[in-house]
């Protein structure tokens, strides 16, 4: 059945499109370069959610309840991804992306200031809202900023840049956790998030 389905699918041939030979900043305008830069800055502070689960354990949550926190933010992220995507279609990508950063900034600040059960749960809710607003809108904004003939290649390059910055994020967070204290990774992430929000103000959306 799979063979029959794929045999009937015909890929449209690209016409008059020059193949993109590698990733080069020469093909990017300053606006897109700035957005890749700010996304990379944010990724440096976007450590793994595993730290949030460990943090909850350190705040007194029992081992059996920690998976509930994981389920909480994943369900929120899944439930709100579509509404945030629809909202970005109405009001633009930048406002929703700014909202996504704001959710995480508030979550990080909450983890710094409040270590009680209620504060941690609210932090996980905000983290879920952050993921719901960030993931669909960020890639969409990049795709709208790039020339159509380079779209797939630059999207791949964007993901590579984010991935390379995300790799040391958890390592840095772990070192800060061990050497400075539990709140140190959240301080760093909060500062980098605020910096990303400031840079985002200078990004111009394609109308």
Where are the predicted features?
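Helix-loop junctions at membrane interfaces in 12-TM secondary transporters
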Residues: 112-123
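C-terminal membrane-cytosol helix-exit motif in multi-pass small-molecule transporters
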Residues: 1-15, 196-204
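Juxtamembrane intracellular "pre-TM" segments in multi-pass secondary transporters
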Residues: 7-38
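Helix-to-loop junctions at the C-terminal end of transmembrane segments
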Residues: 80-92, 177-178
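Short amphipathic helix-loop junctions that connect adjacent transmembrane helices
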Residues: 50-66, 70
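Structural signature of the two symmetry-related core transmembrane helices
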Residues: 95-110, 187-190
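Intracellular juxtamembrane helix-capping segments at the cytosolic ends
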Residues: 133-146
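A membrane-interface helix-boundary motif in multi-pass transporters
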Residues: 175-192
């Amino acid at each position: 059945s799979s063979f029959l389905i794929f045999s009937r699918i015909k890929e449209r041939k690209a016409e008059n499109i020059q193949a993109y030979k590698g990733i080069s900043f020469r093909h990017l305008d300053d606006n897109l370069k700035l957005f890749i830069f700010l996304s990379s800055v944010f990724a440096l502070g976007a450590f793994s959610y595993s730290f949030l689960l460990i943090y909850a354990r350190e705040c007194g949550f029992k081992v059996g309840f920690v998976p509930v926190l994981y389920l909480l933010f994943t369900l929120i992220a899944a439930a709100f991804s579509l509404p945030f995507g629809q909202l970005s279609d109405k009001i633009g990508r930048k406002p929703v992306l700014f909202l996504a950063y704001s959710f995480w900034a508030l979550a990080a600040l909450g983890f710094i200031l409040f270590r009680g059960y209620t504060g941690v749960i609210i932090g996980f809710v905000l983290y879920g809202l952050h993921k719901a607003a960030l993931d669909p809108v960020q890639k969409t904004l990049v795709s709208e900023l790039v020339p159509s003939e380079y779209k797939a290649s630059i999207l791949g390059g964007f993901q590579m840049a984010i991935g390379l910055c995300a790799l040391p994020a958890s390592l840095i967070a772990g070192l800060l956790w061990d050497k400075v204290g539990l709140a140190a990774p959240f301080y760093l992430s909060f500062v980098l998030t605020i910096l990303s929000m400031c840079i985002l103000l200078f990004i111009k959306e394609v109308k």
